[in-house]
């Protein structure tokens, strides 16, 4: 009897445990819009992400073709329900819908219509609906090609459920928008349905590490009144409990690794009547760009600063790099970078009149100027790293968002320039441009091989018997290290704020500070810091000679990783600290030299210490040879960094000599 009672009790407790464990994860959103259910209204945290400020309860996207005015169009029907979990999540009530709508009349375009939104709140135990009025919907032009529809759902606070829906119509029957299954907040349920007429032949690409339900079936639909149905294909994708796309310090574009669906039109095929191949090559892209008035025509134009260049006698400079640098510095006096990246340009006259411009406008002007010096240049079109990688196998203009400039000294030597690198140099570019590119009327080129960050640190210090450590820190920055150092200094409110930040990082008092080369267009910068700090003294002193590390802390601590590791660029840090030990102290045990390598030997760490004639010398070199490490390399990478930081955290033991 006792055994039977315990069995029943165990089953009851186990059932209760399972029901509690699965209570939140079993939330079923109401797929019919206009009436959130009780569970959706009462939920207070995301079942699988307690840090989430909001979550998508339900997102449904339907894509269909319609036939109108003798052509096909695409309609996107989007419906979404969001739960606001905390006050920090109320920004989800601000809705922005970008779409393509050129200023010029005529031509293909997109349009947004049928926008509706409602906020649902529980007030005194009853659900209160607040609909968004039309006066909360605004249209804004982003540029001459893009518009955005903005709206704000009213009465939104922590606990609110938001619903909104709209329809986007597109004249671009050959292009289906990328569908993102994941968003920047967790998604409880999402569905994507696409129906495509049989005459359109698409390639389907599905990416992401999370599992989606997928089905495909043949169907029929009449697109013209009183006509026979056309054969179609229906694709359906569903996802549940998808995590948020979160920022990561070692991933440039987290959305690139999220679950998403891409359709690429391969051909239009009407058997026996019509066939057209829509697969584009880089040759096609090159031809389109060079025919474009805002790209190819900008390259072909003359030099608007020819007289200024002649007056500056730039053509008489014999050194190639100095000649190019002098040309850019003349241009820089006329036009500053406005912080934006672009692929297409504006009128040279307007750019020079305005005095500030995108990197593209600056690049076009430099190409015009160098052409007058008989220096060959070529645009290198690319996609900045924060927007994802460039699809080299199926290129499209839509995948490009800017370009850099290849500058040829001769047939075998090319330098890369970009107008956004105001504090850089030839081959010294912002990290977001260090990616695969395509040279127009040329070939593929990986700008990353131009990127290298080098830093050389030498510290000479004296440790006094009262514990005062005084020294001179000297650091030389090269390449991308120089660019980052200059940017960091210039982003500070003033030099006092910047020096205070450095003092905090060094855990020292800074008596004198200088940074040379900060305003120069050069690949180098030089830093000098005169410092002092207190060391606890006694019969035994634990002294850490590593005042600077490649990264402030161990960069990788998570046991698992769903995304690759992307460093800004290859890097090399060399460090050497010389410390004069006070009289009356000695060092009995100096750490043995050590070499550590990552599993693929693409990161190497070397360290060595010596003690001679009262001088302690500690050095290390840290060399990252490649910038990208895939997920399967992460465990070895994590263990390697842990081992490196164990070495960097080692202390030297000083012992007082008995008198």
Model-derived features with residue positions:
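Sec/Tat-exported extracytoplasmic proteins
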Residues: 170, 331-335, 644-648
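Beta-strand-rich, non-transmembrane domain signature
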Residues: 24-281, 288, 346, 361-367, ...
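Bacterial Sec-dependent N-terminal signal peptides
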Residues: 1-29
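Sec-exported extracytoplasmic/periplasmic mature domains
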Residues: 85, 167, 310-314, 332-336, ...
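Contiguous, well-ordered alpha-helical segments that form the cores/surfaces of helical PPI scaffolds
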Residues: 5, 13, 328-329, 353, ...
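A carboxyl-terminal module marker
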Residues: 499-659
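Secondary-structure boundary elements
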Residues: 282-354
């Amino acid at each position: 009897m006792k055994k039977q009672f315990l069995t029943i009790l165990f089953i009851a407790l186990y059932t209760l445990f399972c029901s509690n464990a699965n209570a939140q994860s079993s939330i079923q959103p109401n797929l019919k819009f206009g009436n959130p259910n009780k569970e959706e209204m009462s939920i207070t945290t995301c079942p699988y992400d307690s840090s989430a400020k909001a979550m998508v309860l339900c997102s449904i996207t339907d894509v269909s073709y319609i036939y109108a005015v003798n052509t096909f169009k695409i309609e996107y029907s989007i419906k979404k329900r969001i739960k606001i979990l905390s006050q920090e999540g109320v920004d989800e009530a601000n809705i922005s819908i970008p779409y393509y709508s050129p200023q010029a009349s005529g031509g293909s375009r997109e349009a947004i219509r049928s926008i509706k939104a409602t906020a649902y709140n529980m007030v005194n135990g009853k659900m209160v609906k607040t609909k968004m009025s039309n006066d909360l919907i605004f249209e804004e032009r982003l540029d001459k090609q893009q518009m955005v529809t903005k709206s704000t759902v009213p009465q939104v606070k922590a606990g609110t459920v938001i619903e909104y829906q709209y329809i986007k119509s597109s004249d671009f029957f050959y292009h289906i928008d990328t569908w993102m299954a994941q968003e920047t907040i967790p998604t409880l349920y999402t569905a994507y349905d696409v129906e495509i007429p049989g005459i359109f032949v698409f390639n389907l690409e599905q990416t992401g590490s999370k599992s989606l339900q997928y089905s495909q079936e043949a169907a029929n639909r009449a697109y013209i009144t009183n006509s026979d149905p056309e054969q179609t294909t229906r694709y359906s994708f569903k996802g549940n409990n998808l995590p948020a796309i979160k920022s990561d310090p070692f991933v440039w574009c987290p959305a690139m690794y999220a679950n998403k669906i891409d359709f690429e039109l391969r051909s239009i095929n009407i058997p026996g009547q019509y066939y057209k191949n829509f697969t584009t090559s880089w040759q096609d892209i090159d031809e389109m760009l060079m025919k474009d008035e805002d790209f190819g025509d900008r390259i072909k134009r003359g030099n608007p600063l020819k007289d200024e260049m002649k007056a500056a006698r730039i053509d008489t400079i014999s050194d190639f790099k100095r000649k190019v640098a002098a040309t850019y510095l003349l241009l820089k006096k006329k036009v500053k970078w406005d912080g934006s990246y672009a692929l297409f340009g504006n009128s040279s006259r307007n750019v020079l009149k305005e005095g500030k411009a995108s990197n593209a406008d600056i690049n076009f002007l430099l190409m015009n100027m160098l052409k007058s010096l008989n220096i060959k240049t070529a645009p290198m079109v690319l996609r900045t790293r924060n927007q994802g990688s460039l699809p080299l196998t199926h290129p499209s203009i839509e995948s490009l968002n800017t370009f850099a400039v290849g500058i040829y000294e001769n047939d075998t030597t090319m330098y890369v320039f970009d107008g956004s690198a105001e504090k850089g140099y030839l081959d010294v570019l912002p990290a977001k441009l260090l990616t695969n590119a395509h040279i127009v009327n040329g070939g593929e080129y990986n700008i990353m091989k131009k990127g290298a960050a080098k830093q050389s640190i030498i510290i000479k210090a004296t440790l006094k018997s009262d514990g005062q450590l005084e020294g001179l820190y000297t650091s030389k920055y090269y390449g991308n290290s120089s660019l980052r150092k200059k940017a960091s200094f210039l982003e500070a409110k003033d030099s006092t704020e910047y020096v205070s930040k450095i003092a905090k990082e060094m855990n020292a008092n800074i008596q004198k500070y200088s940074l040379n080369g900060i305003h120069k267009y050069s690949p180098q910068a030089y830093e000098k810091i005169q410092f002092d700090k207190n060391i606890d003294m006694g019969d035994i002193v634990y002294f850490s000679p590593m005042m600077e590390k490649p990264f402030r802390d161990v960069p990788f601590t998570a046991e698992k990783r769903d995304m690759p590791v992307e460093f800004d660029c290859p890097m090399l840090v060399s460090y050497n600290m010389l410390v004069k030990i006070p009289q009356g102290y000695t060092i009995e045990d100096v750490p043995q030299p050590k070499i550590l390598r990552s599993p693929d030997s693409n990161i190497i760490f070397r360290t060595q210490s010596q003690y001679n004639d009262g001088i302690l010398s500690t050095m290390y070199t840290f060399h990252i040879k490649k910038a990208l490490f895939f997920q399967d390399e992460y465990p070895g990478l994590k263990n390697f960094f842990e081992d490196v930081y164990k070495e960097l955290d080692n202390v030297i033991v000083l012992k007082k000599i008995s008198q």
